[in-house]
């Protein structure tokens, strides 16, 4: 294994944090320009597109999302000593690490930082399958040597479609132990 791509969702309940942020944006910025959070698409990519369309160039909803994440992330996510130890062990073995998020990238950067992973995560990409492919290319490892860590069915399908191996988050420690130390 030469590279690991961590799904943001494998790091914790980021969907709950994102939903809370969208509800906050609708309450706060919806007073400036009406926004019905319940009318937004169910999937995160759809929500991002709808929010961009709604805001246009008039409203900085992404800035408000960043502020919400920074203020509320401790209520939703806690750093994991086990995860951090596994990632350090992988890095010590020369494995390159990236993080893939459904988006937006600004939020993923806050998640990675809050969980204490900033030094170990070399690259972050947000979006669908194209983001995973971009991230795998940026990490420079062949598909056969790249593992996507996730538990989400849709993300497992994306990884399989790109020829990438997959692992569940609780298997990360085992992967670190199995990876050979570079000579």
What feature does the model see in each segment?
Residues 59, 70-99, 105-109, 129-133:
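Short, acidic loop-to-helix structural element flanking the phosphoryl-transfer center
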Residues 9, 73-74, 95, 142-144:
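Short, contiguous strand/loop micro-motifs
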Residues 1, 88, 105, 109-183:
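Asp-based, Mg2+/Mn2+-dependent phosphohydrolase catalytic module
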